[in-house]
Amino acid sequence: MLRKVRIIFAAVFFFFITLLFLDFTGTIHSWMGWMARIQFIPAVLALNAGVVAALVILTLLLGRVYCSVICPIGVFQDIISWGHGKTKRKNRFRFSYSPAKDWLRYGFLVLFIVSLVAGTGSVAALLAPYSSYGRIASNLFAPVYAAGNNVLAYFAERLDSYAFYSTEVWIKSIPTFIIALLTFAVIFYLSWKNGRTYCNTVCPVGTILGFVSRYSFFKPVIDTEKCRNCGLCGRQCKASCINMKEHEIDYSRCVACMDCLEACNEGAISYRFSLPWKRKAEEGSTNEEKGPAENDGRRAFITAAALVTSAAALKSQEIKRDGGLAPVIGKKAPERGTALTPAGSSGHRHFYQHCTACQLCVSACPYGVLRPSTALDTLMQPEMSYERGYCRPGCTKCSEICPAGAIRKISREEKSSIQIGHAVVNLDMCIVNRDDVQCGNCACHCPAGAISMIPRDPDDKKSRKIPVVDPERCIGCGACENLCPSRPLSAIHVEGHEMHRTI
């Protein structure tokens, strides 16, 4: 029964979290965006103490339920492992106990924490489980989903139905796509062969919650009087944490999947209340060494302190400051001296230190402005570019859904007064000078009224007019760059500000 309940909840979470990355209409984000905000790493980086405390308490009460129900990469592994189990009957019972690889677990955890403190967000993003699944969903699943939608839109249009509409299918970043593909391949292989190996050797969240779950109040317990040593529970344990020879369970690796309860035909395993200190006393009577238990507490304390310290350090480092005339040829991105980050991110320092590169904002951006960065120091973290669209002043979608607090929630009014960059004109590329034609497209579409058209020849008021930008009024939305008819590079482009300003 408990296993079925776990599967139902896991399916619901997995379905809607995946849909957050697939839904290009933005409908699902208004209802299910909270599922992204309760993910562990984004909650830590956002200093969302309520969510972090709730997840720790949940783990202390019920074990690593987060890993088996809420975490999408965990459920994804279960789906792959289940699929392998369905190929042959013997594959259902292919697992066996293996000792914990602590040097790997703690090594990856230290690397993750050090990368957070050092500000190398790209390294941390590679290890963060929610971010890993976000890259897989947005880079591998989303194009397939969009292509399927376009097929339905094609047939619906011929039936005079507009229930579906076509959307553009494109790869936003080749390096991020390759990383997502490699991540998918590694997780698929590990899950297909060994179940939850990734969770218990690589995932930093699994290691952190493993410290807590050692002392959980409810957990699977083996009744040695009922046990017949058949080994079925151990052979179906995808976490490989049941040592049948010693009748012990490594609770730091147990993900509370309840598979062992269903596998046991004798009812020798039950999920029940067990006082941590009482259990430790019982273990101590049969085990002469007390060191490991003491070390567990030290590790848990050190890890928690390191996480809180690193998150607080990131928070303290924040600095708050007010502040068709051409052929249809594809646009190329200009070489920007300073990258553009979304309104609400405050600037580069805050954004890059808090962003987990989960790709949720990239998937949700309705105008194709956000895409993963290819720069080494900000690899996979979103950046703005205006070849396919521009950032509407009335759109605040990315600020509404960011689970890590890298993009703070702002109103439409606030966004209209935030300057993320300013436009720069290259008069040599402007078609007024290059092709000797009239234009003014940039000035017509500037929502801030920051672009004026003045005579090219100051002495001849009838001469063709060229654009001039008022940098004090420009908010960096990119409308001018996107709608400029010059190809392949726009004659006007936006340079970002490392620190956003209020105008």
Regions found by a protein language model. Name each.
Residues M1-H247, S252-R253, D259-I503:
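Non-ligating segments of multi-cofactor redox enzymes
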